[in-house]
């Protein structure tokens, strides 16, 4: 497992699918980004709806561009909101069923892109979300700092060498009767 950038274009279809299909969809995203061959055939797979297939086609070209870039910026960062999906989150996801995994990924997406904290719920998805929350908050803080302009720019005009500021002549003022 290696970290990858989670774009809001992945979250959009996930939040529209029911939890079980969202979990399956996200597993396919992870498999695809790990270099595995992913094929979708709605006609022969009863689990996959035409809606599921269309959602996959809507992001497949962006997934391919990201995979070919080997994790480096491929222009998607400038077009879409995003955050790093750490191996820690992926590991938590692998422990969950498709249904719980879908709930988990939806919680993360809602928290990161919509600022919606999940309400207390039964099940492992909520527990795992709470375990991941501290790291998500760190990513959120970096996103907010980046929105403000990120790291401060270096000064383009460095101080000139050999330039000494002139001192005012206090002795001359005292001779003229000005004591202020």
Task: Outline where the language-model segments fall.
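Intrinsic disorder/low-complexity detector
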Residues: 19-21, 29-85, 98, 110-135
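Append "and, occasionally, other polyanion-binding protein interfaces
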Residues: 1-21, 76-111, 153, 160, ...
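Charged low-complexity intrinsically disordered patches
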Residues: 51-52, 58-78, 128-180
